[in-house]
Amino acid sequence: MNFKYIVAVSFLIASAYARSVQNDEQSLSQRDVLEEESLREIRSIGAKILGGVKTFFKGALKELASTYLQRKRTAEEQHEVMKRLEAVMRDLDSLDHPEEASEREIRGFNQEEIANLFTKKEKRILGPVISKIGGVLGGLLKNLG
């Protein structure tokens, strides 16, 4: 009689443990699904912000280039500015596909061309603007998180 109770209690404990393990697995899979959904939402928000920033930068760069080119410049200076603007536009477009961009950079540029994309004057102008935008985006991301 005593043996029957021990077997019955052991069976109940084993079945309860099996149910708890199964419930744990289900809750973990549900958590994984929720985490994946939240990551997708974060990525979509980031993509929208990045798209807006890219659009802003493209417009600002075009305006800056047109203003810069309207001044009296030599044809060589204008050509150099347009080359730089095209390089920046390619960089902005490559933000969507960083793997392809790195391959293009390796094929299309040498190190000297990359180093000489901007002159000192342009760096003085664009540096503070980019740092301000970075600060604003950092603040937005901090508020979202």
UniProtKB/Swiss-Prot annotation:
Quote the protein name from its UniProt record. Maximins 5/H4 type 1
Taxonomic lineage from the root: Eukaryota, Metazoa, Chordata, Craniata, Vertebrata
Enumerate the InterPro entries for this protein: Bombinin
Tissue-specific expression: Expressed by the skin glands.
Residue ranges the record assigns to the propeptide: 19-43, 74-124
Per UniProt, which keywords does this protein have? Amidation, Amphibian defense peptide, Antibiotic, Antimicrobial, Cleavage on pair of basic residues, Cytolysis, Fungicide, Hemolysis, Secreted, Signal
The signal peptide here is 1-18
Q: Where in the cell is it found?
A: Secreted
Keyword Cell membrane among record annotations: no
Tell me which species this is from. Bombina maxima
> What family does the database annotate?
Belongs to the bombinin family.
